[in-house]
Amino acid sequence: MVKVVDGLPEQVLGEFPQGISLEEADGNSVILDIGGGNYATYAHFQPNSILVNEGDRVSRGDVLALVGNSGNSLAPHLHFHVMSVPLSLASNGLPYVVDSFTVTGRTLGTDEAEAEGTPLKIILVDPPGMVTEAMPLDQTVVSFEQSSP
C-alpha cells in the first residue's frame, strides 16, 4: 500500500460537493502498487473505515474499507481505476480486465438522479450473467464472488 487517506467527511447525498481540493477529490482512499510500474486507486470510502496502512501488503479478497461518499462524490460508490503513477489525478489511466464478475443490472437516468438527488433507477438482469476476463461496462451493476480468507 503506497498511499492511504482517511478521516475526510461524507458528502451530502445528491449535492455537488463545494470547495473540494484536488488532494481531497478521491476522498478517503488507498493507492496500491500492483507491480509492473502500475497502481490501482480505490476511492470514496466511509470515514475512518480503512483497514490498511501505508506499507501494508494485501492479497486478493482482503477487505480494504467500507464504500462511502467522501471526496468529490454525489452518492456512495467505489471508484476504481488502474494508472501509470501513484497520483490519481496526474496519471494515465490504463485498461484492465477482471477475472470474473456477474452482471446483475444496469442503471437508467443517472443524470436525472444526480441533478435531482433522487434514487437511481436500476433494471435487474434476469438471469444474471457471469462475465470473465473483461472490464465492467459503464452504468452496469455487478457483483463479485467473495473469496474465503
Residue ranges and their predicted role:
Residues 38-61:
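Short histidine-centered loop motifs in beta-beta connectors
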Residues 2-3, 44-47, 66-69, 84:
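A residue-level detector for short acidic-glycine micro-motifs
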Residues 51-53, 69-76:
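Short glycine/proline-centered loop/turn elements that form peptide/ligand docking sites
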Residues 20-22, 51, 56, 81-149:
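Acidic, glycine-rich catalytic/binding loops that coordinate metals and/or anionic ligands
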Residues 1-46:
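Zn2+-dependent peptidoglycan hydrolase active-site motif and core
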